[in-house]
């Protein structure tokens, strides 16, 4: 059956056929007396609703017949006479339908019952719709599974939002149906009858803001179920476990970092599902220059300065040199080996082409602008360095300056480059047996393509996996002291990983043994042991370790409370305070005890609760030695000593 439901945007007058439910003779025969009685009540109620809103319509004969009979359904509609024998002789007015043998109800094909008074008719309409849910074979034109899914939870705004975002035009029969469906889903999501314009705008901005966050941060924020933008801002500002580089938008390199080593969030999403290749099973597929290069879109390229672009060009040349040094094939179209070349050739690799691409993140378009000459210049540059190295008679030196430094630091294996193979190729170049382009076609078996460290046997292909490994390695490095046999398929990614082994990102406190990833956090922590408080309040002379703490303290004197709760209007002078307060409205308890499962809104409450499991009492009285789990309990206990001391000093009367 086809649905003809009037929508809130329709300007056409509503008639009785638009709000009625029709049954075929087969469907009517499956209904019992109770269901038929329910049908009669709903039909009469729909008619009364139309009359109540002053719709000028004449009473249909169907309504008159329903008012006169408890279970009216004539024989002409295909129902056996024995079900309603007392009305078997009743005839219909032929003016109601061009087919005298059929009732007007036979031409009404409506799946759902829609009334103007939803509060009254809603429960009864649901009972009518339940008839279809009990038996999906009632009608051969029953709605598809997708339409049934869309009918579930019609009042759930989140479900309506997801269906609105996942809407596909191809699922509709035409543009009018598609537009009506979109309007209905949007109406269910935004609920304009219950929300103001400001609240609707807040919902739209909230969705867009969440989509603009980095993937890792957005996943965590959505798990907290924020209801508005203020809660999202408070959550993001309170995040301390994510690095500054991960928070920066894609295409905006952090200060002091090498732009060529950055991989955008869009690339990480595309590469997230890529497989990790073990070291023992090396890929046999030929590798091209695009497989080991770092890509920038045109928008990202526009954000780079001249120095960063020059650095990018140098690294791309260096990466190409690495390919040549280990014998990877990079071919140019329309270039073939000379007929007199007697060097055995293996299966050729895919050609390296520099051309425009329709992808958002493309290497070829940017590389063409950057290298200013394409692959030909890169090849000539590499060959010049090879010839220069030979003229200086330094057979043990790599063809690039940074190779030596990397070999000394242990990041590159000296066996990765087959110098004998390169010398033989150079001799053929000098003898005229090979031209410069043919040198690049000589292939050394790509068994040396991956760079290793020392202890673990893994392979990493993407920057996101490098970062994950960095964090796990930093936690274990101080305890184990061993190297890492992590393997990478991209030399640029390996350079990023080398920083871990230098120890620049791991800082251990000599006083308490605490480890910090960020040197700035470590410098702040050291002031706790030294007692240094360089930031002093001019009003009261109180000192602080951090400038942010001083700024927060100064609001006590000025009375400034810039953070306001949108729910109750309460104001706060600190971000962390409003973040904790918002949890009282949302009911979020993110800190959960691993022993008993009890959850808390604040981490300090969880720490205090865990002492009931461990029995720890860190606050001890220096006079009697009694220990307490909370500092407030210790302060209250110390007052008993002070009162006793004062009583002893008072003279007896």
Swiss-Prot record:
PROSITE patterns: KRAB (PS50805), SCAN_BOX (PS50804), ZINC_FINGER_C2H2_1 (PS00028), ZINC_FINGER_C2H2_2 (PS50157). Residues 161-243 form the SCAN box domain. A zinc finger (C2H2-type) spans 507-529, 535-557, 563-585, 591-613, 619-641. One of its GO terms (molecular function) is RNA polymerase II transcription regulatory region sequence-specific DNA binding. Transmembrane segments: none annotated. Residues 405-414 have a biased composition (Polar residues). Residues 459-470, 636-653 have a biased composition (Basic residues). Residues 136-159, 339-359, 388-414, 456-485, 632-653 are annotated as: Disordered. Residues 388-404, 471-483 have a biased composition (Basic and acidic residues). One of its GO terms (biological process) is chromatin remodeling. This is Neurotrophin receptor-interacting factor homolog. The gene is ZNF274.
